[in-house]
Amino acid sequence: MTIDTTAFRDMAAVLRQRSGANVTKLAYVKGKWKLGRDKIEVNGTQWAARVDWTLGGWVRWFDGRITDYRLGYVADRYMPPKRDELGDLDEEKWEWGNYGRDPWQLAWSLPLFNQVSGEEVLYSTDTMGGKDALAALLTAYADRVDSSPADGKILPVIELGTSSYRHPQRGEIHVPVLDIIDWAAPPTKPRPPLPKAEPQKALSGPKDDLADSIPFN
């Protein structure tokens, strides 16, 4: 199998610039990895990462819900469009329904699976620390693929960790750590298709069923 690793290295650079199945959500909150609606703490657990299915792009929020998106797979060499190409540029309208925050946010998603149980989870992030962790993982994956391991094990097996640093104004800042502890062969399961992009919408109400159509959501 031949894999072009250039796309993964390109996306790693983008991440450093600061710029569907019913899968359980994995979240990193203030130094704690939390799984699912019950927010079970899973620091130190191990997962195989489907870096080859890394998904990223712009997600549009309204009143705490996804209302539009421009997403693509890294493996397809997808690069997010520039922010000014997405519309919603009038900051005065951001206050209504979005608390003054830009409704369009860059977000990245990494599918993970348990090698024993087969459980699938999805880690999504739009933070600087999360982007740095994913950038490092994409680079390590590209290096591994370029080395052409004879056993075909190109997916990183990671342990969920955490670190922190002291910010002069904001105090202690927690950042996620994805430590590579092993490598695994990719399963034969086909990659989920992407949803079709929706036409531009005004800053009005959320679309009820849009979030359910996003892969892994």
Map each language-model feature to its residues.
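Interfaces that engage single-stranded nucleic acids at replication/repair/recombination sites
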Residues: 191-217
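Short linear motifs in intrinsically disordered/low-complexity regions
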Residues: 5, 147, 180-183, 209-213
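Conserved binding-pocket/active-site segment within a compact domain
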Residues: 98-198
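OB-fold ssDNA-binding interfaces and closely related basic DNA-contact patches used
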Residues: 1-119, 169-175, 180-187
